[in-house]
Structures are given as C-alpha cells and as structure tokens.
C-alpha cells in the first residue's frame, strides 16, 4: 500500500475523474480555454504531420482525403444529388471544409476532457486514429502504406497532448504544509515531506494546503474542488507555439512534396499523334453564336466535372498501363506508347452526368481523340456470354459499360485528347473512356487502368449498389439557355434558344411553348453527327406580362421528351425545362 497522505493537502492538477481522488485530495478545475486550445493544437499537429508523411507515401493516405473518400462512399444518393446541385464542382471543397469543422469541434471537446483526465483524452485520440485507419485502408486502391500518415499523425498528437496537458495543470508537482502552529509536529518518517510528491498521482499536479485560497471571506465548508488550477501560461504558450509551427511546416512541406508528383509537366510534353480518321470540320451553322447560348464546343476549362476523387489522381504517362482480361481469349496489357501507336479516331461526343437535373449544367460537348475500344476487344476475343466491361480507375472507382454498346459500331474510345490537347488531369489524363449515348457513370471512366470483361450478374460498378441502374442510356432532353429569367425583357422579338440532346440517336425537332399556348417549332442548328447535342432557336414576339417558357425535344426515333417530372435517381431526370420571364 502507498504511504498515507497528509491531512490538509489537496491536489491542483489533473489527477482524478471525480472531484476528489481516492485518497481524498480535491481535483481543481483547469480553465476550459486551455482544454479547447489543447484539443485544437493537438489536431493541427496530427493533420500537419500526417500531411507531411502523405507527401512521401502518397496523398491518398492523408486522413482528410481518406475520410472524405469514405464519406462519399457512404453518402446516400439523394444527399449526393443535393450536394451536386447546391455546390456543383465545389462539392468536394465543401466536403473537406465540413470534415475539418467537425474535426475541430470534436478535437476541442477531447481537449477539454484531456485537461481533466489525460487518459480519457488519449482514448479520444485512439478513436480518431481508428477512424482514420479504417478510412485509409478501406479505399478500393489502398495499401498498407496508406496507414503510415495516420499513425505518424497519431504519434505526434499523443506527444503534443501530454505536454500541453501538463502545462495546463501547472509546472511542478510540489507539496506544501499548512502553516505552522504551536505544537505542530514534523512529518513522521515515511510520510511525504515538503518536497515529496505523494504516490499515485500524475506529474503536473500541484499540491497546496486545502485551506489555501480560502480567505476570511470564503464560505465555511467550501469544497477545495471549486478552486481553479493555475496553469503554467508561459510553458503552455511555448509548447503550443512550437506545436503550431510544426503543424504549419508539416502541412506546407507535405503539400510541396505532393506537388512534386504532379504530372502537369509530363502532360505538357506528351506528343499526341495525328488521327488516322479525322472528322470533317464543323458544318456551317453548327454554332448559332447567340449571346448566352452554350457554345457548340465546350471549352476544357468550362467542362463539367463530377466524380468521387477528393484529390485528382496524378498518373505518369511512363507508368500507365491498361489491362484487358476476364472473359477473353487473350489477355492484353498496353502501355501508353503502345496505345498511341494504334490508329487513332476523332469524334464529337456530348457527355452527360446522370445527376444532371432537368435543364441542368452537367453536360458538355467536346472533340475526343483516342483508340477504338471495340478494335482492342476484338483483338482480345470476347467470349460468349460476356455482357459487361467493368472498368476500373487508378483510384479504385469502377463503372460497368454494356459490351453491346461498345461493339455496335459507335465510336467508343480510349480517349487521350480533348479539344486538340492531351486530356486535362481533371478529365482523366492520360487515358479515359468515352462511350456515346450512355450516362457518364457507365461510360466515361477517367484515369482508366483496367477492363474486366464479365457479366452484370457477376460484378457491379461503383454506383449500382448505391441505387443507380445498371443500364443507363441517355434520355432525350432539352434546355433553355436564353432568356434565363434573371432580368426583365423588352416587348417585341426575343430569341429563345438552347440545346437538346439524344446521344447516338440524334435530335430531329425542338418545340417551344409560351404559357399554355400551342407548341411552336424551333429552328435547329446543323450537327456533325448523332452523338452531340444540337443548338436551337425560336423567335418569340413577346408581349408584356409574366410568362412561362417551356421546351421539348424529339429524337430521330420519333420519341418526344416526356413532361413527367422525375429526379436523377436511378437513371436520369425527366421533365420539361421551364423559364419564368417578365416582359415589360
């Protein structure tokens, strides 16, 4: 058993989970602000060190990236659609900010707990470490190295938390005797003296007389636990400043190391051969050049981006390979040099995201250049019964493309260029899949590295188990670009214009209606083929008042866009696009 504790002493510091420790000494309160600061600084160091290590092992091991990816995986489709519609291309940024805010809140709470009971604070760190490890190791393309940043950050966090908690509790553990009184005796041998620390307590606790701080004005019987500890402010400030500096340097150095893996220079120096099969120039009148109308060719910088990548994969051309395997007679593996030596094909193709709402922005048209996927599959020899190409990205994302859609004669490409330049990194550099006529989640795998020829019964792409359809042909739709309803119109002749699409079928007609009036035929622009959207315009003699404009398209099969309103899930939105306008 430990030595009996001297009567009349209490602890100032972090020693017990209750108001008094097992020996009866009171545990005072550490100011809450010190706890909040302890938690936030600890979290900052953990993130900074983890970022530094992730710059070496790979950015996908960053805890924020890993947790963000896991959050995307677990996000229900309605919430995903809301995020895309509300934040657009900034949805990933909003997600990361949200993760950091939640981290700060919980870190502050853990810090408040830690200055009262260090072991509880360390337990909180252990929980966060476990979450980070599970997120890092559960990613589709993860490996053991992805756990290293999380573990390194956790180790640094433990060291910082311990030092800050001790500083918050006071610098030196000392014992003080009550004031001498006549007849008072010196401590007996074996009892703690003035410079001894009673056993069973953590370093950092300060020992003072139980009556200390209770002057004549103190109420009789006041509990010592009501006293507030006196942190070593200087020590806390020094330790905290050093920790913040470490966090900042780690974050900046980690970012610099990550940027070293950028493929921007490799992309700029990549030579793309001329296509063997070029498309004719755009026919006259393909672009109506109406102010506010989407241009026929979407610039790369304006092309929509919807994917699951928190950070853009940086795939070096020299290390890229594509494997074609599964239900084939001959497995194929191609490097980028080998792919570029194949006959290359150009094609104008409009891509559409299945998350696009009626009249939404997640659609774009580009001139793609690449190798024919059908040609490669014929070389591999597809076995009877194969129905799906399960395509995998370098970051583990998968999409399931119907074999029939690739082999029916359409220009399904392993694209290497977009609008005359190598693919932008955000759009799949160095190679992506482009299959006309299908929504992007089953036809446009970016950063593609693997094609498994299989069946829909044996494998599912990423979004299918999350509630989206296996088969996803693009629906016949239209959009009104101008007028947009943002400003009043003048009475008189007004150009109502927009785009319509029915990829791999083609648009044959677009009609416009004002309020409940009759449908009016719009004039269609020329197109180079059936795989692109089509511009249209209708001249309206606008009359004063409030009006609603509607549009509908008819494709080359005779199908007319439905008025039935449906959300994007599970296979694309439907309904008429409408614009409310005021004419003065």
PLM regions and their residue ranges:
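Structured, non-membrane catalytic/scaffold regions adjacent to prosthetic-group chemistry
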Residues: 104-105, 118-119, 141-145, 163, ...
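N-terminal secretory signal peptides and thylakoid transit peptides that target proteins
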Residues: 222-244
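Membrane-embedded alpha-helical segments of integral membrane proteins
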Residues: 93-182
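Membrane-anchoring hydrophobic segments
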Residues: 1-119
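Membrane-interface elements of multi-pass transporters and channels
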Residues: 56-60, 90, 116-117, 167, ...
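Alpha-helical transmembrane segments of integral membrane proteins
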Residues: 30, 34, 38, 42, ...
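Intrinsically disordered, low-complexity terminal tails and inter-domain linkers enriched
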Residues: 20-23, 167-227
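Extended acidic/polar, glycine-enriched regions
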Residues: 227, 245-247, 252, 259
């Amino acid at each position: 058993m430990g030595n009996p504790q001297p009567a009349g002493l209490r602890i100032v510091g972090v020693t017990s989970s209750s108001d008094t420790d097992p020996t009866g000494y009171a545990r005072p309160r550490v100011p809450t602000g010190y706890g909040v600061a302890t938690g936030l600084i600890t979290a900052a160091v953990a993130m900074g060190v983890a970022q530094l290590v992730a710059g070496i092992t790979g950015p996908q091991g960053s805890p924020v990236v890993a947790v963000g990816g896991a959050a995307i995986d677990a996000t229900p489709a309605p919430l995903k659609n809301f995020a895309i519609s509300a934040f657009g291309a900034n949805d990933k940024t909003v997600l990361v900010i949200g993760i950091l805010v939640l981290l700060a809140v919980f870190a502050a709470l853990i810090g408040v707990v830690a200055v009262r009971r260090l072991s509880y604070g360390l337990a909180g760190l252990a929980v966060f470490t476990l979450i980070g490890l599970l997120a890092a190791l559960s990613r589709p393309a993860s490996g053991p190295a992805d756990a290293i940043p999380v573990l390194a950050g956790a180790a640094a966090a433990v060291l910082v938390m311990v030092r800050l908690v001790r500083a918050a509790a006071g610098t030196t553990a000392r014992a003080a005797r009550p004031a001498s009184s006549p007849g008072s005796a010196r401590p007996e041998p074996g009892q703690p003296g003035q410079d001894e620390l009673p056993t069973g307590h953590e370093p950092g606790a300060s020992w003072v007389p139980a009556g200390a701080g209770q002057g004549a004005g103190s109420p009789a019987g006041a509990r010592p636990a009501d006293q507030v500890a006196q942190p070593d402010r200087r020590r806390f400030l020094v330790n905290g400043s050093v920790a913040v500096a470490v966090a900042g340097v780690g974050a900046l150095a980690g970012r610099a190391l990550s940027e070293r893996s950028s493929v921007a220079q490799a992309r700029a120096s990549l030579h793309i051969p001329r296509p063997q099969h070029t498309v004719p120039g755009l026919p006259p009148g393909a672009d109506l050049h109406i102010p506010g109308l989407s241009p026929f060719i979407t610039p790369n910088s304006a092309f929509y981006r919807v994917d699951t990548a928190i950070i853009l994969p940086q795939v070096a051309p020299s290390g890229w390979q594509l494997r074609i395997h599964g239900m084939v007679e001959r497995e194929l593996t191609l490097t980028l040099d080998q792919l570029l030596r194949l006959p290359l094909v150009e094609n104008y193709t409009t891509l559409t995201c299945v998350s696009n709402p009626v009249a939404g922005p997640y659609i774009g048209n580009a001139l793609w250049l690449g190798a024919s996927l059908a040609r490669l599959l014929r070389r591999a020899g597809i076995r009877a019964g194969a129905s799906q190409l399960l395509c995998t990205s370098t970051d583990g994302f998968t999409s399931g493309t119907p074999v029939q859609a690739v082999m029916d004669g359409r220009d399904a490409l392993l694209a290497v260029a977009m609008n005359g330049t190598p693919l932008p990194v955000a759009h799949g550099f160095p190679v992506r899949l482009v299959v006309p006529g299908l929504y992007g989640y089953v036809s446009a795998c970016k950063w593609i590295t693997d094609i498994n020829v299989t069946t829909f019964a044996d494998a599912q792409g990423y979004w299918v188990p999350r509630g989206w359809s296996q088969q996803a042909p693009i629906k016949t739709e239209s959009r009104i670009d101008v007028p947009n309803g943002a400003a009043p119109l003048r009475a008189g002749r007004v150009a109502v214009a927009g785009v319509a699409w029915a990829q791999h079928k083609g648009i044959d007609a677009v009609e416009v209606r004002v309020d409940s009036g009759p449908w009016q035929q719009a004039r269609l622009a020329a197109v180079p083929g059936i795989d692109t959207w089509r511009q249209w315009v209708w001249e309206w003699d606008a009359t004063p008042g409030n009006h609603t404009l509607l549009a509908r398209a008819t494709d080359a099969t005779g199908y007319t866009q439905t008025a039935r309103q449906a959300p994007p899930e599970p296979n694309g939105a439907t309904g008429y696009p409408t614009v409310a306008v005021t004419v003065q």
